[in-house]
Amino acid sequence: MNPKVMRALGVVSVLLFLGVLIAFAQPKGETVKVKGEVVDLWCFLEGGDRGADHKQCAISCAKAGNPIGLVTEKDEVYAMMGIKDHQPGREVLLEKMAETVTVEGTLVKKGGVQAIYISSVK
């Protein structure tokens, strides 16, 4: 077979393979915009702790590795997840702890847990 054709087939094969990897790496769910307060889930779930008075504690807990969540006005709780490198979006959300933000992303519900894979935070 012609070397140029072989090279072209190789490039096409690699691109198809990468496309399949990307498709499987993206979470499956609906795109949503959710407004709520950024909280550390440990303190919020354990004692309902949130708000400006709890901000420094929440930052410390999140830096220690506790999960970060979003609580809406209706007390709906979402775990915050990142898409890139499976990171939980800490870089963006740590500085917004105890603030009200709008998160855009992909909502996934499974086993009683609802999580948003973050696309943007405003």
Name every feature range the model reports, one short phrase each.
Residues A23-K122:
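OB-fold and OB-like single-stranded nucleic-acid-recognition modules
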Residues M1-R7:
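N-terminal secretory signal peptides that target proteins for export/translocation
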